[in-house]
């Protein structure tokens, strides 16, 4: 969440940032936070005065008793009792204000960096790089018309999966429901090969591998910002009050909740392979066909914790890492800098990676790489101690490297030939075969 210091000292900047994100009633939300904080501070000021007064009376009581002034001592005791009652009331007012303030701050999103483009929707996202051509200033999703084509009709991955017996969508419906496919034979082997390839590449890049739980408590969900913002999209086990994770970002980042790191140990670089679970309420049509949008899927996540001074450099390294994976998989891609209106609730800046599906005639998102500035760290109380022994909030960053479903779809669709489906060279050591036929 945003810090009170930022909200109170740079109020106009915060309001403008929230408006850039198209957050409704930005000014009212900020003013409410300031008003609640004022109530809290006023209660604290009154409480401090009462405690000081009570301390003064307490000191007098002993002196009066020694002097034999029992009546005056009893009167002082009565005053102390009144002050204690007033102090208890103020403690309650202050605690309620703090609780209300925290709850309210959790409903206010992060503010975007200056370099985040203006815009209200995906059409306004800026294309900053592509494997297809040089990008020009003004290139956006809305006006981008460059796509790969070889002039041959291509089958979509759901037809290829059936043709080569790789994925059974109907069997998944029988076992669980829509959005839970069953991978079979070389389809399962391809999935496992990608997981091993992505983890191996992350290890080479210096990431420490983590194997976290796939269920988390509410505190973890609040720490990274999925709660309360995305509660409706998460699977919740009410009996135990636990949530299935939508991404490894949640458990891996929460490792550092309520932790003070040493600056010399930064950046922290972790990666994790997990199953991810998302309700995806409201999705329909071509968005959910085949592997396009699932309720359960495999993903490798990279997570970094860094200092404010070095987080932009960390972000650049993460972007380069994800781009390198797409190059090795020989997939046509483009990189988008998301506009304010299309950014997530918690991010300060985000880049999406998309690969093109000729068979579907559309771009498919395969990764988002975000810098959250201090937004998550403030919720998590994730801090570091610098060389001067000063404790400060860290910056947190994460990204998909990569999410498997659409990568599998792209590999099947882009590499189909008359003889079968060609496996990208970088994957062959992991699959053990060069063709699916």
What does each model-found stretch correspond to?
Residues 1-141:
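N-terminal alpha-helical targeting/anchoring segments
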Residues 131-437:
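TRNA-recognition modules of translation machinery and tRNA-sensing kinases, especially anticodon-binding
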